[in-house]
Amino acid sequence: VNGIALCQEQRAAVELALTNKLSLILGGAGCGKSTLIRAIVNMVGAGHSMVLCAPTGKAARNLEKRTGLSARTVHSALGMHPDEDFLAPVTWNTTQLVVVDEASMMTLEMLAGILHRVPKICRVVLLGDPNQLLSVGSGNVLPDLLALGVPCARLELNHRQDDEAEALLHNVVDFKK
């Protein structure tokens, strides 16, 4: 997809993200979620308004590092101060894509803030690892959205193996022969 090599389940996840207003992409560490973010952003195209964010500062910095794209915390993107109950006047009128990484840590308030802000032309993609930490605030966002039937792609294939792990795997396979 636009110069990014994707496996079949990743291509299906990109299609899901680009054809639904709200979608979930779930998978464990190393399954290619960061690669998917780059592919989705490339498909939407340069010059279009996008917001990439994560629930915590550390997660936002990791998102930037893994994708090479600018990212913020959800609170910052929404113009929220974590200790206050108001939204600053942030305009998302032309935003066409919102990507939230580490969505398992989102609170209901964060999700509500995002869904309240997005215009009709916008797609919202929530990525997360169902085995990761849950939000310390209110809600169980990913399980709740799954229960509501929000379209979801599940990534099972691990793409991140270092040489040592691969050598160990080959030794196990050779041993069984």
Model region roles, listed by residue range:
Residues 1-177:
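Conserved ATP-binding/catalytic motifs of P-loop helicase motor domains
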